[in-house]
Regions:
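Conserved acyl-donor/pantetheine-binding loop and adjacent beta-alpha core of acyl/acetyltransferases
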Residues: 58, 73-83
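Conserved GNAT acetyl-CoA-binding A-motif
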Residues: 112-130, 304-315
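Short Gly/Ser/Thr- and charged-rich N-terminal loops/segments
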Residues: 49-59, 247
Length: 383
């Protein structure tokens, strides 16, 4: 039934790999319960823990959402309380006011019935394109209207943004030579430099996963960000690598090598005509040979060959200047010739404002402790 769900959501506006059956199965291994919500054109709303009943739905699907549920506590007075999250969902035509009202009404009812402290959504609703306050800044009126509707209904901009709100999107529908032409000259130069310096490239396999995690851990320690344990990433990578959606692989590890030694890698995810650069990693050696540039160029060509019309580089700054921690990464992505896309971000609906306030105050402290422990554990793992 996994393919049935994926087929269903792939026909909706802005389908995303974080809404796939595979992502629900990944999260199910780590304490989340996946629910599958479907709205049909006959006015019915289907909400189930499994996808088994999808084949029985008679109406045409007009909206859908993978909704993840997690209990806050396993016992005690708050054992019934939960949090709900629809990553990059719900999927629907947000310009359709009647459908939008219907979906939001049902989601708010679900949040109340499930005893949720909050329900978080972060659909790919575009608020604007280009860097804010620059000549290429183009606001999106439909996106602005959807945001206003959420706020009118009592949904609040979340202090806990799980996904990147802004990103860089590369158009893969143009010929390869035009993709190159859209890049900054320095980026094209670095791609040629990598080739000249003997940087090789290959598509990896499941056997490479231990090596790739070690490289990712090395990157996290060097660049100062926190990662999860090895089993988590192996679960995500293996599940998507072994899954095919519409005949194409869902994820590919792309590995750059110097003298047959891996020096950098990225994971390329693909779903419903869009590719995603989700995980990037590199060794501390041979960085002057620019393997990261060659990898992105190969990723663009592979994604295009697999029917993807766009490549999401997964993240751009909140503030477009050097004060933002993502500024350096953004300059690299900008050089690849993409367009900045600014989206809605995450909004929360909180049925119980008191519990929501308590959760919002306590959880950041818990996460700070967990991040500190996570950094130390990763360092120890590298020896």
């Amino acid at each position: 039934m996994a393919n049935l769900w994926n087929d269903l959501i792939s026909k909706l506006p802005n389908p995303h790999f974080l809404q796939t059956h595979e992502w629900g199965q990944v999260k199910a291994k780590y304490g989340w319960i996946p629910y599958y919500a479907v709205w049909t054109d006959d006015g019915k709303f289907h909400f189930s823990q499994t996808t088994d009943s999808l084949s029985l739905i008679t109406g045409q699907c007009v909206a859908a959402a993978l909704i993840l549920k997690k209990q806050v506590l396993s016992q005690g007075f708050a054992a019934r309380l939960s949090i709900l999250y629809a990553p990059k969902g719900p999927l629907l035509d947000w310009k359709n006011e009647h459908l939008r009202d219907r979906v939001l009404n049902d989601l708010q009812t679900v949040a109340k019935k499930q005893g949720a402290i909050f329900l978080k959504i972060d659909p790919d609703i575009v608020l604007g394109r280009g860097v804010p306050n620059n000549a290429d800044d183009v606001p999106d009126d439909a996106g602005q209207a959807a945001r206003s509707e959420l706020m009118r209904r009592g949904w609040g901009y979340s202090s806990d943004q799980i996904q990147f709100q802004n990103t860089v999107l590369i158009d893969l529908s143009v010929p390869v030579n035009e993709m190159l032409a859209r890049m900054k000259p320095k980026t094209r130069y670095n791609i040629r430099l990598a080739e000249k310096k003997g940087v090789g490239f290959r598509v990896g396999g499941v056997g490479d996963l231990p090596m790739l995690y070690k490289m990712y851990a090395e990157t996290s320690v060097r660049d100062g960000f926190v990662i999860r344990d090895e089993n988590y990433y192996k679960t995500v990578w293996r599940l998507f690598m072994q899954s095919t959606i519409h005949g194409q692989p869902s994820a590919l590890p792309l590995i750059a090598e110097v003298n047959n030694e891996p020096v950098a890698a990225i994971f390329l995810f693909m779903f419903a005509g869009r590719a995603y650069y989700v995980y990037g990693m590199s060794r501390n050696i041979h960085r002057e040979k620019m393997p990261a540039y060659l990898l992105q160029w190969e990723a663009m060509k592979i994604a295009g060959a697999n029917g993807c019309a766009a490549y999401d580089l997964w993240g751009a700054p909140d503030v477009f200047d050097e004060s933002d921690s993502m500024w350096g990464v953004y300059r690299f992505k900008e050089g690849l010739g993409g367009e900045v896309v600014r989206t809605l971000g995450a909004y929360d609906f909180a049925p119980n404002k008191l519990w929501y306030k308590l959760y919002a105050e306590i959880m950041p402290r818990v996460l700070d402790v967990m991040r500190s422990r996570g950094k130390e554990k990763t360092k120890q793992g590298l020896g």
